[in-house]
């Protein structure tokens, strides 16, 4: 198979972990006889500094013409600390999602047995937890009508039937591939938009008789995720709720540096780590590259290259078992490996496998 990959390294630690993802992908392609070409493009604060736009038209062209995007992270404190800034790095991420029609964000939440001690929750609660959070990406308050003056502000949480149906379809289809349990998360006791979500989910559920479908208010879901994370198989929800719940779910694993994600929809899919740009660690060779590397595994699996994805996951598991880890997940007294060293170890494992 031939792959054409757009690489958007972004800001902060993005360029460092991006390199590791690319090297892992190249090693896997070489091993399995695939051809891969990379085209690099700018985004986020880097793009604002260079051209004044966090997602320039040239970057959009590169993404649109690729088979997939390997994205890293955007964000810079100089924008976070300036409430008057008209252009922000994160707007580039929103623009990419909107222009590429990426309406579904898929985030796996799972624990690694050798790292359960890193979770803030008790080991017996989190060991074996394995579920998907599916978040709608292009509707709701983040994209609705907005207004702000000195005395009043509002954001509009609007959803249409087609937007809800297509993301629920993704949820049901993933549930069919897994343990056949779908939880629809809403706030139907208060919000009209949530009542429409629940109504449509109830209409669609009979089309998937093998799937057990339940409904949960978002506040209850937030508690359940901590109290009983193994309850969930596939969770689907709207944009704002999903943004919060997926970050909460990342805590279960013990490190945001372990979890990848995929954003899919009408055009080129995007694969990325769930963590941010961590600018304080830029250039220090301490960032965990595993989420970026596992994003590459998700990329291969998206294109039905299951053996390739499985090899990457096996290599990551082996690195953890061998205590080849960056500082935030290393055992006490263990050797602290850098970003480059972890990536190189995994590449070497893949080549020798």
From Swiss-Prot:
Gene Ontology terms, MF aspect: 3-isopropylmalate dehydrogenase activity; magnesium ion binding; NAD binding
Keywords: Amino-acid biosynthesis, Branched-chain amino acid biosynthesis, Cytoplasm, Leucine biosynthesis, Magnesium, Manganese, Metal-binding, NAD, Oxidoreductase
Marked site positions, Important for catalysis: 142, 187
Record: residues binding Mg(2+): 219, 243, 247
Residues at which substrate binds: 97, 107, 135, 219
Pfam families given in the database record: Iso_dh
Protein name: 3-isopropylmalate dehydrogenase
Organism: Bacteroides fragilis (strain YCH46)
Gene expressing this chain: leuB
């Amino acid at each position: 198979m031939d792959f054409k990959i757009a690489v958007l390294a972004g800001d902060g630690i993005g360029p460092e972990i991006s390199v590791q993802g690319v090297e892992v992908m190249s090693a896997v392609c070489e091993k399995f006889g695939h051809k891969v070409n990379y085209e690099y493009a700018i985004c986020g604060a880097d793009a604002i500094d260079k051209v004044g736009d966090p997602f320039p038209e040239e970057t959009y062209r590169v993404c649109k013409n690729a088979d997939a995007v390997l994205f890293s992270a955007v964000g810079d404190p100089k924008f976070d600390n300036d409430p008057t800034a008209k252009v922000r790095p994160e707007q580039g991420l929103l623009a990419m999602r909107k222009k590429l029609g990426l309406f579904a964000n898929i985030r796996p939440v799972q624990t690694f047995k050798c790292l359960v001690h890193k979770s803030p929750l008790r080991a017996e609660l989190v060991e074996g937890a394995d579920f998907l959070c599916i978040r709608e990406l292009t509707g709701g308050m983040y994209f609705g009508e907005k207004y702000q003056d000195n005395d009043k502000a509002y954001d509009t949480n609007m959803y249409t039937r087609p937007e809800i149906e297509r993301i629920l379809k993704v949820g049901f289809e993933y549930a069919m591939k897994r343990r056949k349990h779908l939880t629809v998360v809403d706030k139907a006791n208060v919000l009209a938009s949530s009542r429409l979500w629940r109504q449509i989910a109830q209409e669609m559920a009979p089309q998937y008789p093998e799937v057990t479908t339940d409904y949960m208010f978002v506040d209850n879901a937030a508690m359940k995720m901590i109290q009983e994370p193994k309850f969930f198989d596939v969770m689907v929800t709207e944009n704002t709720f999903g943004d919060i719940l997926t970050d909460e779910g990342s805590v279960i694993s013990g490190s945001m540096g372990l979890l990848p994600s995929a954003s899919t929809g009408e055009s080129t899919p995007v694969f990325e780590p769930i963590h941010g740009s961590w600018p304080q660690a830029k250039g220090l060779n301490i960032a965990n590259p595993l989420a970026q590397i596992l994003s590459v595994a998700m990329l291969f699996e998206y294109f039905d290259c299951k053996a390739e994805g499985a090899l990457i996951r096996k290599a990551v598991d082996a690195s953890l078992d061998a205590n080849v880890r960056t500082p935030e997940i290393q055992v006490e007294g263990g050797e602290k490996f850098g970003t480059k060293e972890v990536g190189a170890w995994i590449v070497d494992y893949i080549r020798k496998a």
